[in-house]
């Protein structure tokens, strides 16, 4: 079967924002206007297409990133748009990270009342990291307090982004009727009676003309700056054509020089079709993003062009267990080069294993369309892969490549979980392992001292969802402990240590001997290991076993048994025996040397520090700041908001934030709100060990 749509008519986009900015509603409207669905769901009714999990519908939030294919007609052509609706809650930031890794462009949705909010800042920085071109949608222009210019100002000031207005709102709050198109210089008025399916173009009303002329002049200047020939025309006073402006803005957007801004109200069915036009006009096709880079198994640089006839390569960016396929694993892939066919075998270059692709599906949230092939530049899901994990590369075994893997943050909070009966013991461990495969920011470990199973995640809501899924999907009966801080440990000085494991039992013995240099690593770098053994005194395979022993020993630190982070290890000397040396002997020797070294390297306990933003009326500001100081918080700054409200930015230890929402409500008569996300780990006070 040949490719249905040429690659230049593909758009792989994400929809991202702060929680409650209207991402899922915007996605729902896009699906309706593209004909992918025939009835619009609403978040408050719990029946949207992309929020298909029970937990999402009950809470009215997006938890997982849902992938959907839709089609849009533009310039007399049909375009295929693969859309991923991502979560806005900070506990599910990892879902955004996974999606951005495989997207070509994004729509960032902002609330017209609040502008840039903490999580919109986080996802914007994540998109910067992956160099994803973006268009902006100022949503909720119908809300009381909606302010388009303020919102654009926050994009420019808080994000340092060059926001270029492509539209102005045609009225705001209850007078919001549509948008002013600054390219065509026309007013687009949306009909309330037809769910916004049609809009009329008309002349710009007199009261908006002056503002529209000024905004258009700014748009033309931004367009002219993207192209020398246009700059010359612009300076000579020659009118730029619509196509010239559109092409120049596209060039600036793809080069991350500027970010086109649109507006509307998704809930009131206004402004969504022009936003879809903008996806086609300003966001890249897979052909317009740089070729994907990776390494060969030998460590040499490798590149894959986005071509159907190139060697096959794809990245597994999401794993989920799907009841519709008898609970088989569903693996989401971004195909970067070549093509994938159902029934063929692929090579997992990270695991070094071959697996067969039994079935391919194209996703429509929780509905699946069976397909036989998936081509370069597309996103699809594979049924039944047993070995692939998030971030693994699937490729052609004759021309293997390992694509850059994803980094996942350390969990900050954990809870103990115990089966209610021995029958549930194995079931609970299997279920937790399957959930950990789906979500790399969720970890499972056993406390060696107590034997308790601990599950760790990015926040209370994250773990609440995990527990809820255990009980409902996997039918596990368990006792759940109270949330606790996920402390970590590290070393603060450098130590050299010898590790020996020698056993003689009459037959073949065991001999492992290694010297390690253990030192602090850069914050956030995790565990790193370097082989500096020279002269062949210890072979590479035995040094690899030493590395495995060290990595295993990292799971239980010397201070209080918490996992260790940010430790750098160098193997620099040792010896081996011609007969008795084995990988297991060197693994044990490495583990012994590491444990002795970290005990001597002045180990410390680390606690998670959170970035908090508290939005409070002026009247309660003194009380709120005093309370933060009492929680060992450090105020970083304050930003005035409209209506005698202040946004306080602070860094506070997570240990001091349990129960904070209840305290804040009582201090502010229920009028203050806060958001919190992980910042970094820092040394904990000695009193933390006594808790």
Curated annotation (Swiss-Prot):
Highest taxon listed in the record's lineage: Bacteria
BP terms from Gene Ontology: ribosome disassembly
Family annotation (InterPro entries): EF-G-like_DII (IPR053905), EFG_II (IPR041095), EFG_III (IPR009022), EFG_III/V (IPR035647), EFG_IV (IPR047872), EFG_V (IPR035649), EFG_V-like (IPR000640), G_TR_CS (IPR031157)
GO molecular function: GTP binding; GTPase activity; translation elongation factor activity
Keywords: Cytoplasm, Elongation factor, GTP-binding, Nucleotide-binding, Protein biosynthesis
One GO term describing the cellular component: cytoplasm
Positions of GTP binding: 17-24, 85-89, 139-142
tr-type G domain boundaries: 8-287
Compartments, record wording: Cytoplasm
HAMAP family given in the database record: EF_G_EF_2_B
Family recorded in the similarity comment: Belongs to the TRAFAC class translation factor GTPase superfamily. Classic translation factor GTPase family. EF-G/EF-2 subfamily.
Function: Catalyzes the GTP-dependent ribosomal translocation step during translation elongation. During this step, the ribosome changes from the pre-translocational (PRE) to the post-translocational (POST) state as the newly formed A-site-bound peptidyl-tRNA and P-site-bound deacylated tRNA move to the P and E sites, respectively. Catalyzes the coordinated movement of the two tRNA molecules, the mRNA and conformational changes in the ribosome.
UniProt-recorded name of the protein: Elongation factor G 2
Source organism phylogeny: Bacteria, Pseudomonadati, Myxococcota, Myxococcia, Myxococcales
């Amino acid at each position: 079967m040949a490719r249905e749509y040429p690659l230049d008519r593909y758009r792989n986009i994400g929809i991202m924002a702060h929680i409650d900015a209207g991402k899922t509603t915007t996605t729902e409207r896009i699906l309706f206007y593209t004909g992918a669905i025939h009835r619009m769901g609403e978040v408050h009714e719990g029946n949207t297409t992309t929020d298909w999990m029970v937990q999402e519908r009950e809470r009215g939030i997006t938890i997982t990133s849902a992938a959907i294919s839709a089609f849009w007609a533009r310039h007399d052509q049909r375009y295929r748009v693969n859309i991923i609706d991502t979560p806005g809650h900070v506990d599910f930031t990892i879902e955004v990270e996974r999606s951005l890794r495989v997207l070509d462009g994004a729509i960032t949705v902002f609330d017209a009342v609040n502008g840039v909010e903490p999580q919109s800042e986080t996802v914007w920085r994540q998109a910067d990291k992956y160099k994803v071109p973006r268009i902006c949608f100022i949503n909720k222009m119908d809300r009381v307090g909606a302010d388009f210019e303020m919102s654009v100002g926050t994009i420019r000031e808080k994000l340092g982004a060059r926001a270029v207005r492509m539209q102005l709102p045609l009225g705001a709050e209850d007078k919001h009727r549509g948008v002013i198109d600054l390219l065509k210089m026309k007013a687009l008025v949306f009909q309330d009676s037809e769910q916004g399916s049609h809009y009329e173009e008309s002349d710009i009303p007199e009261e908006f003309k002056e503002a529209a002329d000024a905004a258009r002049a700014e748009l033309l200047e931004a367009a002219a700056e993207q192209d020398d020939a246009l700059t010359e025309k612009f300076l000579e006073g020659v009118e730029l054509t619509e196509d010239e402006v559109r092409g120049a803005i596209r060039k600036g957007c793809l080069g991350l020089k500027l970010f086109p801004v649109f507006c509307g109200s998704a809930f009131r069915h206004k402004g969504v079709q022009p936003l879809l036009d903008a996806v086609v006009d300003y966001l890249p096709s897979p052909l317009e993003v740089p070729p994907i880079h990776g390494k060969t198994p030998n460590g040499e640089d490798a590149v894959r062009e986005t071509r159907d006839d190139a060697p096959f390569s794809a990245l597994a960016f999401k794993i989920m267990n799907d009841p519709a396929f008898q609970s088989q694993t569903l693996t989401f892939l971004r195909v970067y080069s070549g093509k994938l066919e159902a029934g063929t075998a692929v090579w997992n270059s990270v695991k070094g294993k071959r697996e067969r692709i039994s079935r391919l599906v194209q996703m429509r949230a929780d509905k699946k369309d069976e397909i036989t092939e998936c081509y370069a530049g597309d996103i699809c899901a594979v049924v039944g892969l047993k070995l692939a994990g998030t971030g693994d590369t699937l490729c052609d075994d004759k021309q293997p490549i390992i694509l850059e893997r994803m980094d996942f943050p350390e969990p900050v909070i954990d809870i103990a979980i115990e089966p209610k009966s021995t029958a549930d013991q194995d079931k609970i461990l299997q279920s937790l392992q399957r959930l950990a495969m789906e979500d790399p920011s969720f970890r499972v470990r056993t406390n060696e001292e107590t034997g308790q199973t601990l599950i760790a995640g990015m926040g209370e809501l994250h773990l609440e969802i995990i527990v809820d899924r255990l009980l409902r999907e996997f039918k596990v009966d368990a006792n759940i402990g109270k949330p606790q801080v996920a402390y970590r440990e590290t070393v603060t000085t450098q130590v050299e240590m010898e590790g020996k494991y020698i056993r003689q039992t009459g037959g073949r013995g065991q001999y492992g001997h290694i010297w390690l240099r253990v030192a602090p690593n850069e914050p956030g770098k995790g565990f790193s290991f370097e082989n500096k053994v020279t002269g062949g005194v210890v072979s590479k395979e035995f040094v690899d076993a030493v590395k495995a022993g060290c990595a295993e020993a990292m799971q239980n630190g010397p201070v209080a048994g918490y996992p260790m982070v940010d430790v750098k290890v160098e193997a620099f000397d040792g010896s081996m025996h011609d007969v008795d040396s084995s990988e297991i002997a060197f693994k044990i020797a490495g583990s012994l040397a590491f444990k002795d070294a970290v005990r001597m390297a002045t180990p410390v306990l680390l606690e998670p520090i959170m970035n908090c933003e508290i939005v409070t009326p002026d009247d309660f500001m003194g009380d709120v700041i005093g309370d933060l100081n009492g929680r060992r918080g450090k105020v970083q700054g304050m930003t005035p908001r409209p209506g005698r409200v202040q946004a306080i930015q602070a860094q506070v230890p997570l240990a001091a934030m349990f129960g904070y929402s209840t305290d804040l409500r009582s201090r502010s008569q229920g009028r203050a709100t806060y958001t919190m996300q992980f910042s970094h780990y820092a040394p904990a006070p000695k009193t933390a060990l006594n808790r």
